[in-house]
Amino acid sequence: MGLSDEEWKKVVDIWGKVEPDLPSHGQEVIIRMFQNHPETQDRFAKFKNLKTLDEMKNSEDLKKHGTTVLTALGRILKQKGHHEAEIAPLAQTHANTHKIPIKYLEFICEVIVGVIAEKHSADFGADSQEAMRKALELFRNDMASRYKELGFQG
């Protein structure tokens, strides 16, 4: 299920538009995930008590976490599928420490595509969106494989 060179170029090119403003993109991704899938918010002790959109938008911790998530994802995407070195420690912490189900990775990946589509509509057409979805599916599948190796049934 690999991506073609052309698809990877689309992924890396759009990520180049996202990177200059990771805090804003990351914050929007986390907020939208919590709004669309409220059960995900319960996994975050720091964010459990943020009840309103204003509270979420004003949380520096939430913005920092969103930045951390997208920074890690950017490193993975830039590896164009050769991301084992980045995936291994991420799977370890997400399986053993945070206990994040793969389903939640599906949720956040779809939110990421939606946020990029809104913020960069002129540069993120259907073909680029499909390439990003394929890249994110590859990431999730590799995380799921690592989870299995670690004995986590997430």
From Swiss-Prot:
Family matches, as InterPro entries: Globin, Globin-like_sf, Myoglobin
Membership in a protein family: Belongs to the globin family.
Listed GO MF terms: heme binding; metal ion binding; nitrite reductase activity; oxygen binding; oxygen carrier activity; peroxidase activity
Binding site for nitrite: H65
Gene Ontology terms: biological process: removal of superoxide radicals
Alphabetical UniProt keywords: Cytoplasm, Heme, Iron, Metal-binding, Muscle protein, Oxidoreductase, Oxygen transport, Transport
Protein name per the record: Myoglobin
Subunit description: Monomeric.
Residue span, Globin domain: 2-148
Any one Gene Ontology cellular component term annotated for this protein: sarcoplasm
The enzyme's E.C. designation: 1.7.-.-, 1.11.1.-
Binding site for heme b: H94
Main location as per UniProt: cytoplasm
Domain of life: Eukaryota
Catalysed transformations (reactions): Fe(III)-heme b-[protein] + nitric oxide + H2O = Fe(II)-heme b-[protein] + nitrite + 2 H(+); H2O2 + AH2 = A + 2 H2O
PANTHER family named in the record: MYOGLOBIN
The protein's role, per its UniProt record: Monomeric heme protein which primary function is to store oxygen and facilitate its diffusion within muscle tissues. Reversibly binds oxygen through a pentacoordinated heme iron and enables its timely and efficient release as needed during periods of heightened demand. Depending on the oxidative conditions of tissues and cells, and in addition to its ability to bind oxygen, it also has a nitrite reductase activity whereby it regulates the production of bioactive nitric oxide.
Compartments where located: Cytoplasm, Sarcoplasm
Family matches, as CDD domains: Mb
Residue numbers binding O2: H65
